[in-house]
Amino acid sequence: MTQQIGVIGLAVMGKNLAWNIESHGYSVSVFNRSSEKTDLMVEESKGKNIHPTYSLEEFVNSLEKPRKILLMVQAGKATDATIDSLLPLLDDGDILIDGGNTNYQDTIRRNKALAQSAINFIGMGVSGGEIGALTGPSLMPGGQEEAYNKVADILDAIAAKAKDGASCVTYIGPNGAGHYVKMVHNGIEYADMQLIAESYAMMKELLGMSHEDIAQTFKDWNAGELESYLIEITGDIFMKLDENKEALVEKILDTAGQKGTGKWTSINALELGIPLTIITESVFARFISSIKEERVNASKELNGPKASFDGDKKDFLEKIRKALYMSKICSYAQGFAQMRKASEDNEWNLKLGDLAMIWREGCIIRAQFLQKIKDAYDNNPGLQNLLLDPYFKNIVTEYQDALRDVVATGVQNGVPTPGFSSSINYYDSYRAADLPANLIQAQRDYFGAHTYERKDKEGVFHTQWIEE
C-alpha cells in the first residue's frame, strides 16, 4: 500500500510535521539519513499511520503518484545533496517541498534547475517552531502554482487556524517568494524582540521595576493593542523563578544568538535600496550583545550618565507602551515596503494583505494588529507605506510625542535604545519633504564629478566648485 506523502529529515521539525500531517488523516512515509532517528520515530509513533523506510529507493517507491515529498533537512548543501540523490528516482510531475530555513536565492536556483527535469518544486517557509510544527504552523509556500494546488489540501489541513477559522497558509508566489516572505517575517521578528527588550531595559534600569511588576505590565499590555505572542511569553518569562526563587531571566547571559535570517533580510534591503533601519539595528544589537567581554571592559573605562528618574513613573510607563506600539508599526511599515519592492522586482505579485492574515496564528510574530494591516491593504491595495493608512497615521500622530520622550530620556540617562531611536528617525525622515541629501550630492560632485539634479530646472549638472 502506498502512502500519500513522504517526509525526509526526522529532526524535531520534520518529525513534528510528519505527526501533524498524520493526525489529519494522511498516511506518511518517513526517511532519515541515519537509521537511528527512523527507529526512534517508529518507537514514538506506535498506533500512528507512519511508515518507516531505510533507503531513498524504498522511500520513493512507498509513495503514491504524483509523489509529494517534504524535505526537512539542513538548509544549504544538505538540501542540494538530498535533491540530487532523489532526482534519478523520481518521475515527471512529482512534487518536492523544501520546508527548511532556506535562503530564497537558493530556492530560485533550485526552481530553475528542477524545471528542466519536469519535477515540481515548492520552497515553503515554516514558522512556529517545534510546537507550531506539531500543532499548526504558519506556512508560506512559493513555486509553481499548479504544484501548490496539488498539495493545498494537506497544507490547509496542517496549518494553524485563526480565530475566524481560516488556515494560516496561502500561495505566496513563484519560485523563491515563499522563502523570501519567511525571511522578512524573521527580520520583523528580530525587531519585535529588540523593541520589547528595550522596553524591559527602560522598566528595569530607569524605573527600577521588579520582575513581578514587569511581568504584570506585559500581561496588562497583552490585553490591549499590543496583544501578541511575544508580549504574552515575555510576561511568562518574568514570572519564572530559578532554584533560588529569583527571576531566571536575570541570570541568563546577555548575549543574543541568531541563525542569520535577520542578517539576510538586512543585506537584501541594502541590495533593494530600501531603508530597513529598525530590523537592521536589531541585528546589530545582537552583534554588540555578543561581544560581552569587550563590553565589560569598556564599562570600566568609558563614562556616561547614571540612570535615574524622578518623574511620574506610571505616566512614563504608558509612554513606553506607546513608544513600543509606534515603533512596531514603523518596523512593519519597513518590512512590508521591502516585500513590496521585492515583489515588483521579481514579478511575484505578492498580496501583502494576505501575508498579514497567515501570520495571525502559528508564527512567532502573531499579533492582533495584523488584522489592521490586512484592512489597510484591502482599503488600498496600492498603499505605498503602512504609515499612510488612516489607522496607522492616526496612531503614529498621537504616539510620536511619547516615542520622542522615551528616546530622549534614554539618551539622557545612558540607556541604549537603538530600535526606538531608529524608529523615530525613520518616521521623521519619511515625513520630511526636504532632507540634507542636497549637500551630499554637492560633495559627491565636488570630489568625484558625480553630477546632480536641481529643484528649479530640468537637466543634470556639474559644477567647478573652486576656481583653478
UniProtKB/Swiss-Prot annotation:
GO terms for molecular function: NADP binding; phosphogluconate dehydrogenase (decarboxylating) activity. Keywords: Gluconate utilization, NADP, Oxidoreductase, Pentose shunt. NADP(+) binds at G9, L10, A11, V12, M13, G14, N32, R33, S34, V73, Q74, A75, N101. Its EC number is 1.1.1.44. SMART domains: 6PGD (SM01350). Pathway: Carbohydrate degradation; pentose phosphate pathway; D-ribulose 5-phosphate from D-glucose 6-phosphate (oxidative stage): step 3/3. Pfam families: 6PGD (PF00393), NAD_binding_2 (PF03446). It catalyses: 6-phospho-D-gluconate + NADP(+) = D-ribulose 5-phosphate + CO2 + NADPH. Substrate binds at N101, S127, G128, G129, H185, N186, Y190, K259, R286, R444, H450. PROSITE patterns: 6PGD. InterPro entries: 6-PGluconate_DH-like_C_sf, 6PGD_dom2, 6PGDH_C, 6PGDH_Gnd/GntZ, 6PGDH_NADP-bd, 6PGdom_BS, NAD(P)-bd_dom_sf, Pgluconate_DH. One of its GO terms (biological process) is pentose-phosphate shunt. It is an enzyme of class 1 (oxidoreductase). PANTHER family: 6-PHOSPHOGLUCONATE DEHYDROGENASE. Catalyzes the oxidative decarboxylation of 6-phosphogluconate to ribulose 5-phosphate and CO(2), with concomitant reduction of NADP to NADPH. Homodimer. This is 6-phosphogluconate dehydrogenase, decarboxylating. It comes from Staphylococcus aureus (strain Mu50 / ATCC 700699). The lineage of its organism: Bacteria, Bacillati, Bacillota, Bacilli, Bacillales.
